Amino acid sequence: EKQPKFDYSDIKFKDNGKLKLIIVVGTRPEIIRLAAVITKCRQYFDVILAHTGQNYDYNLNGIFFKDLKLAEPEVYMDAVGDDLGATCGNIINCSYKLFVQTKPDGVLVLGDTNSCLSVIGAKRLHIPIFHMEAGNRCKDECLPEETNRRIVDIISDVNMAYSEHARRYLADCGLPKERTYVTGSPMAEVLHNNLAEIEASDVHRRLCLEKGKYILLS
């Protein structure tokens, strides 16, 4: 059984003079939505990609790095615990240790998963936090994602909303306008970058489906 990783003395930035950025992911949606962003960030910044291990099955994780032509993460935290409390605690603890030992200039997260709670440690260490998909609300406080997104929105230094509607939610929370930007969704770039592979896919044959004759539910 894997144990959470707390020692990151083997993880180093390249120290190439570029901004040192840690991107934290942990689930399939984050990997997909951030694919184009990760590629662009690696072009302009000194990047460490850290995976919390929230989704650790190959079909929910590894296959997407392969299909989206992304390099494997530099860090696997293996933060999944025996229950929700242990997992959330491990994510915060592992991330805090990673930030202390690598000293990034910024931390980027997307969305509202438990992996986004990694930024709590960044806030305590006064590391700037960049939050994509900020301002989303479902108004159901029983959902754990609603709690996560409210926490991350409030403590982030830069909130990147997908829409003007989401930006207004951030304003209603009291966040100043200089901390919020409407950037749109990065999924358009992900689809554009992978359009040839999507059109050439044999998934219909493999799943015995006929185009236009099925409904996809997720």
Where are these regions (language model features)?
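Structural beta-sheet core signal
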Residues: 23, 49-51, 109, 131, ...
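Glycine-rich helix-loop-beta junction characteristic of Rossmann-like nucleotide cofactor-binding loops
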Residues: 13, 99-101, 207-208
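N-terminal subdomain of nucleotide-sugar transferases
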Residues: 2-54
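A nucleotide-sugar donor-handling region in carbohydrate enzymes
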Residues: 2-9, 54-59, 78, 155-218
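Phosphate-coordination loops involved in phosphoryl transfer and adenosine-cofactor binding
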Residues: 18, 104, 211-212
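Active-site and donor-binding regions of nucleotide-sugar-utilizing enzymes
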Residues: 22-25, 30-37, 64, 76-176
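Conserved nucleotide-sugar phosphate-binding/catalytic loop shared by glycosyltransferases and other
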Residues: 46-87
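Gly-rich Lys/Arg/Thr-decorated short loops/hinges at beta-loop-alpha junctions or inter-strand turns
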Residues: 17, 72-75, 218
